[in-house]
C-alpha cells in the first residue's frame, strides 16, 4: 500500500509544476507594474571592493550617500547628483555672453563675466566702453565707474543718453541713397567675387586705382571729392570733411601745378556740366616722407609715404545736398577700438578699371576687409609704419591698380559713416598676398582738428 501511495504523490507533484510556473513567473513588463527593484545585498567580498559609480548607481538605483562613498568628495558628488536626479539643466547652454552654467536639481545657476548680469547673463552692464561700445551710437568714454556717450559733429545726444540724433538734413556720414545690405555686405562681395582686390606693386606706387569695382549710385558716397589738374584731368581723390575742408594724400599735392575740386558727381565724362571749385590753401603734413629715389636705387627710402596726409582749404564753401555730405571725423579711441575692429570698410574713386587703361568716368565703390597688422607687415617688402594699415583681399583675382590716391576709406557704424583711411600706396596689381595700404586717420585726429581750426 505504501509504494502505491508514494507513486500517487510523485505523479501529483509532477503534474502541478507547469501550473505553478505559469502562475508565478510573469513577463517583465507586467511584473514591473507592481514589483519595485530593490538594491541587492553586496556579497562579503563586494563590500570591501573600492566604490564604482557604474556598479553602484548605473546598474542599480543608488542613494546620495552611496554616490558620496564613490567620489569621496562633496563637490564632485553634488555635480554628479544634480545630473543623476533630473538630467543636466545646462545642456541647452542657457547662459549668455560666455557665462558659466552650474547644474542644480530642477534648476541651474549662471556665473556671468564682468559687465553682465541676470539669471542667464542676458543683461549688459555698460560700465566699460569695450563692451558693445558702452551702448553708445557714436563715441564712448569712461567717467568714474560709468560710461558716457557723445556724438559726432552735427549730431546731438538723444534723451536716452545713448543714441545720436542728426541736427540737420545733411549731417555728416549720412548716405541717404545707400546700397542695400545684400549688395554691400562683405560676404556677398567675397562669394560672388564682385569686390575689387586692393593689392600692392613691385615698387610702392602712390597711384592706386580701383579696378573692377561696382558703379556707385548717386548719393551712395556723398563725401567723395575729385581733384582735377590744370589740364582738366582726374589725378587724385579726396574726402569732404566740412564745407571748406577736403582730406587727401600728401603725395597727390606735388603732382600738378594747380588743383581744383569736384563734388557730388558719379559721372565726370561731361566736362561742360561739371563745376570746378577753387582752392584757397593746401596743408601738407610737415613729416611727410616722399620717395626721393626710384625703386631699386640703393638710397631708396623704404619708409616712403609715411605721414601721407594733407588738407585742402576751399575758397568758397561747398554746398551740401543729398549727394554732397561730409564724412564724420571719429575720435582716435573710437576709430581704433570700434571702427577698425569691424569686418570691412568702403573705398571709392574714379580710378582705372583695368591696368594701364584710362581712368574711369564713373565713380566705383568696393568693400574691402581689414587686414590684421601682423599679416599686413609680413605681406610687404616695405615698412608698414604706425601711420599705415592694410585692407583688401589676398586671393581673389581682382585688384586695385594705379590711381585714386587720396580717396576715402570709410567705415560705417550703424547708419553713420566715418573716415578711417586715405588711399595711399601699393605694390603692383593682382599679386597674391598683397594688400592696399592706407594712411591711418586715427593717428592724425589732433593734426586734422588743428588745421581745420585755422582761420
UniProtKB/Swiss-Prot annotation:
Gene3D superfamilies: Coagulation Factor IX, Laminin, Trypsin-like serine proteases. Residues 1-20 form the signal peptide. Residues 210-453 form the Peptidase S1 domain. It is an enzyme of class 3 (hydrolase). It catalyses: Selective cleavage of Arg-|-Thr and then Arg-|-Ile bonds in prothrombin to form thrombin. GO terms for molecular function: calcium ion binding; peptidase activator activity; serine-type endopeptidase activity; toxin activity. Residues 86-121, 129-164 form the EGF-like domain. GO terms for cellular component: extracellular region; extracellular space. Glycans are attached at residues 92, 254. Keywords: Blood coagulation cascade activating toxin, Calcium, Disulfide bond, EGF-like domain, Gamma-carboxyglutamic acid, Glycoprotein, Hemostasis impairing toxin, Hydrolase, Protease, Prothrombin activator, Repeat, Secreted, Serine protease, Signal, Toxin. The modification 4-carboxyglutamate is found at residues 46-47, 54, 56, 59-60, 65-66, 69, 72, 75. The vitamin K-dependent, enzymatic carboxylation of some glutamate residues allows the modified protein to bind calcium. The active site is at residues 251, 308, 405. It is found in: Secreted. Is classified in the group D of snake venom prothrombin activators, since it requires the mammalian factor Va for maximal activity for the cleavage of prothrombin. In contrast to blood coagulation factors that circulate as inactive zymogen in plasma, venom prothrombin activators are always found in the active form in the venom. Snake prothrombin activator that attacks the hemostatic system of prey. This protein is functionally similar to blood coagulation factor Xa. The procoagulant activity of hopsarin-D is approximately 10-fold lower than that of trocarin-D and FXa. Heterodimer of a light chain and a heavy chain; disulfide-linked. This is Venom prothrombin activator hopsarin-D. It comes from Hoplocephalus stephensii. The lineage of its organism: Eukaryota, Metazoa, Chordata, Craniata, Vertebrata.
